[in-house]
């Protein structure tokens, strides 16, 4: 009898402890969202047990839906879901991105989507960020359209502008379909007519003014719109030689200028292009190489259509 009573007491204690841990987990997630400094790696909040039901539904929707296969890059980056589709080295890198407390630079995704650092942007930018989070139509995908659109030609140098125009207009760059795939997502019915018109406009027009999001993220050209701390971080991302994991962003901008990276990094990029596995990781191939159709398999090309 005493033993049964002891077991019952132990059950209630452990049950209460589990509930306490759950509350702590959710509180940690809420703290990630609410805090203004946003110095931590906020993708931790996207773990299944650490997000709200609404966020979980969105995440599961991104994973399970059959269309818009190209959008799986988001799942790969956030959750490091590799299940045999990437090498051990890549898996270690992915897990490292998720688990480590540093890597402040990778917060750009959280900042842009969830508008976490309110004090670090202008009122106009804050309104845009809040709109991305709160509006009801296609919440998950609008950040891409707005990020790409929202800026003007006058905010970058002539050299940057030439690069952006070249990416859109040159005929050789067939592999740069990531822009088409991410914007259009091959599922027109999932956005409003206005958004669809914008997406088609981004694909067909020659000026491609909307490509400024990339320049702004990396080169911090609109200095007046961010704090000194953010400006230093942006410049640091471009100039520093460390933090190899974040070099994919620099690689996307500089389009494989071999002299601008180490041999090790170059080998990694070439490996991403040549191997046939890890289809979900094709966003990296597309964004880094931005090269020709011949560098992917027929099956991969079919997935992009």
UniProtKB/Swiss-Prot annotation:
Modified-residue entries (Asparagine amide), positions: 83, 118, 188, 223, 258
A Gene Ontology term for the protein's cellular component: extracellular region
PTM annotation (Lysine amide): residues: 153, 293
Superkingdom to which the source organism belongs: Eukaryota
Tissue specificity annotation: Expressed by the skin dorsal glands.
Keywords noted in UniProt: Amidation, Antibiotic, Antimicrobial, Cleavage on pair of basic residues, Secreted, Signal
Prodomain residues: 19-35, 52-65, 87-100, 122-135, 157-170, 192-205, 227-240, 262-275, 297-305
Subcellular location: Secreted
UniProt key word Mitochondrion: no
GO annotation terms (biological process): defense response to bacterium
Signal peptide (from-to): 1-18
Annotated family: Belongs to the maximin-S family.
Entry function: Maximin-S1 has no antimicrobial activity. Has no hemolytic activity.
Protein name: Maximins-S type B/C
